[in-house]
Amino acid sequence: MKQDWKPGTMIYPLPAVLVSCGKEESEYNMFTVAWTGTICTNPPMCYISVRPERHSYDIIKKNMEFVINLTTKDMAFATDWCGVRSGRDYHKFDEMKLTPGQCTVVSAPLIEESPLCIECRVKEIISLGSHDMFIADVVNVRADDRNLNPETRKLELAEANPLVYVHGGYYNLGEKIGKFGWSVEKKKS
């Protein structure tokens, strides 16, 4: 039996990412975002949704760029902490002992400890209500060599223990149960 609930955003799990921003080291910040995802494959575009009162909101709006840094089980404490502490009060890179790194295309820092860093340039900002959506072009992706299969050179991100968010909690992924298209594969005879 199913129950009716009030309308809400119940699409879980979501990636729990750290978004980094700032052009100058003095304004570098990172904050936790779960409202993020892919918008388009070609051209590659993604989004983050941010409350206007967040410290990083003005930094991103001013510089029109940010980096989406995927997080891992090892980064879980920092991921939570950066979501409940403000960059107005703390230098989060120092507090969490995470390393700001240089991006290839954007001026915002990436997080060296992240297995995958997605460099983004803001294309449009849409005011939606509690959050504004920053729609962005993906201008570069930096992948950690440790997550590349040495034989195929394919990215094996599941091996990095990515962190996901489910309605108030952080989790790792479970076992792989199939691959894209496996439901229609022809059986080998």
Identify the function of each model-found stretch:
Residues M1-S189:
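Basic, polyanion-binding surface patches
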